[in-house]
């Protein structure tokens, strides 16, 4: 099935409970780089957070902790750690409990980063499904972010997710729909 990228400046809103098909969601979601001041509605935010809660984690440890930041004071603190909020009125800081993660056989990897990534991915796709624009932000020092926000010492920050509605005229970057051929990224053994 061919996936058609919709030529829009922002994601279609979820009006009347009509949802996009999953392939449309993944094809049309893009990293928004400038937001209007319109706040994300509570019911849409709840749907986004619920998608993260339903994400699978190693051994179902559910070591994630998502911080919702909306106040001007806390957004200003985030702005001291990363320049990549792009004016989003809501951000999610996705962290995980480093004392409650699964250590894989061999002891070289733990599940916290992977599990938090799965959770964040569920939430970012749920945002697109709700018609909410987003940006995955990892341009910051995780330790400084945790310290700035006063997070518990056992929690490690994975990423920041900008949420909101694109400012007028803002859309995907020119390279958004450029993808390598499947043959370049997949090998059958």
Please provide the spans of the model-predicted regions.
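Acidic, surface-exposed loops and disordered segments
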Residues: 2-189
